């Protein structure tokens, strides 16, 4: 009897892994705003939905790392839905306080940029499967603002 249950579990697990799932990628990370307290970057994420109906996004959570340190994080509750059989573009604002940027002076160096890693968890609600988190990550360099960005 136990082996029958194990076979049933394996069968269901195999079928669930074969179900197509939405996939995403970070397409760009750009400077959005500079103010007295922080720098705001905008991460552009594209997500493809293989299903013929829209899928609600429950939450977007993200962490922004540089030089092995977390320099920004946040959550965006209920940001909308993924379009049916289409690509959906999502904008994720990432705010980094200047106090943290100044602590990264070693990484900034001569070229006035920071190396980053952005990790995003896109939590969606799939029928039958339930809540499912799509992990999306990106690594790259971002130029820091200069005085001309302020004026």
Swiss-Prot record:
Superkingdom assignment: Eukaryota
Annotated transmembrane regions: none
InterPro entries found in the cross-reference section: Lea14-like (IPR045043), LEA_2 (IPR004864), WHy-dom (IPR013990)
Stretches assigned to coiled coil: none
SMART domains: WHy
GO BP field: defense response to fungus; response to desiccation; response to high light intensity; response to wounding
One Gene Ontology CC term in the entry: cytosol
Disulphide bond pairs: none
Family that this chain belongs to: Belongs to the LEA type 2 family.
The protein, known as: Probable desiccation-related protein LEA14
Protein species of origin: Arabidopsis thaliana
């Amino acid at each position: 009897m136990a082996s029958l249950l194990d076979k049933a579990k394996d069968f269901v697990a195999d079928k669930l892994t074969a179900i197509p799932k939405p996939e995403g990628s970070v397409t760009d990370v750009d400077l959005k705003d500079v103010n007295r307290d922080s720098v705001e970057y905008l991460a552009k994420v594209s997500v493809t939905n293989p299903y013929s109906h829209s899928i609600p996004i429950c939450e977007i959570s993200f962490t922004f790392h540089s030089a092995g340190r977390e320099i920004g994080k946040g959550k965006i509750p209920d940001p909308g839905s993924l379009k049916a059989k289409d690509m959906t573009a999502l904008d994720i604002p990432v705010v980094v306080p200047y106090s943290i940027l100044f602590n990264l002076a070693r990484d900034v160096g001569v070229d006035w940029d920071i190396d980053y890693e952005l990790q995003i968890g896109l939590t969606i609600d799939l029928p039958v499967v339930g809540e499912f988190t799509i992990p999306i990550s990106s690594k790259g360099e971002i130029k820091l603002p200069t005085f001309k960005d302020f004026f």
